Swiss-Prot record:
NCBIfam families to which the protein is assigned, alphabetical: cyt_tran_rel (TIGR00125), nicotinate (nicotinamide) nucleotide adenylyltransferase (TIGR00482), PRK00071.1-3 (NF000840), PRK00071.1-4 (NF000841)
EC numbers: 2.7.7.18
CDD domains in the record: NMNAT
Gene3D superfamilies: HUPs (3.40.50.620)
Protein name: Probable nicotinate-nucleotide adenylyltransferase
GO function term, MF aspect, one: nicotinate-nucleotide adenylyltransferase activity
Organism: Streptococcus pyogenes serotype M6 (strain ATCC BAA-946 / MGAS10394)
Length: 210
């Protein structure tokens, strides 16, 4: 898997900077996680490995500005599924600050809070290549890029352009979505191998997405 950087530094320099400082390098993968699935986990794990991050935090949104609330199940279920998905998984953890804060989850507000709470951490905010095109429309984007380093996940050989500093990480295409899984379950089909078995067992036990 290839790593391409469209920023002023390289992976080697990033590793050297880590050795020379005590600052932690933490990735953030935000999402509705309704439910979490294997593509989420592959992205989080591969970004952590390719960039040599200390950890990647999966951050469930409370009320994302772009998601219909009617399609989002209770946060307690989403959080339980996240916990089951990363149980015993090295390098992945959960950040719940947006659930605790409640209200609409704007990335700028969240990252301002996290950087103030953890001044010894450098944050890498992970987004899909499709979201890179929308960065100019993000809430307070010019201030946000001063708080975090964006990491764009893309298919090999796919090129997305942006004037904002983005580290590009190439990953194989996994055409899995939460809406696909919900649709499978609603139609009585088992979404085997699309999400962790423990998560699927929880969905079945709780009767979710029927």
């Amino acid at each position: 898997m290839a790593l391409e950087l469209l920023t002023p530094f390289t992976k080697v320099e990033l590793e050297e900077e880590k050795k020379e400082s005590n600052r932690k390098q933490i990735g953030i993968l935000g999402g509705n996680f309704n439910p979490i699935h294997n593509a989420h986990l592959v992205v989080a794990d591969q970004v952590r490995q390719q960039l040599g991050l200390d950890q990647v935090l999966l951050m469930p949104e409370c009320k994302p500005p772009h998601v219909d609330a009617k399609e989002t199940i209770d946060e307690k279920h989403r959080l339980c599924m996240l916990e089951l998905a990363i149980e015993d998984v090295e390098g992945l953890a959960i950040e719940t600050c947006e659930l605790e804060r409640q209200g609409i989850s704007y990335t700028y507000d969240t990252m301002l809070y996290l950087t103030e709470q953890h001044p010894d951490v450098d944050y890498y905010f992970i987004i899909g290549a499709d979201m890179v095109d929308y960065l100019p429309k993000w809430h307070r984007i010019d201030e946000l890029v001063k708080l975090v380093q964006f990491v764009g996940v893309q298919r090999p050989k796919y090129k997305a352009g942006t004037s904002y500093p983005v580290i590009w990480v190439d990953l194989p295409l996994m055409d899995i979505s939460s809406s696909m899984i919900r649709d499978f379950i609603k139609k009585g089909r088992q979404p085997n191998y699309l999400l962790p078995k423990r998560v699927l067992d929880y969905i079945t036990q709780e009767g979710l997405y029927q």
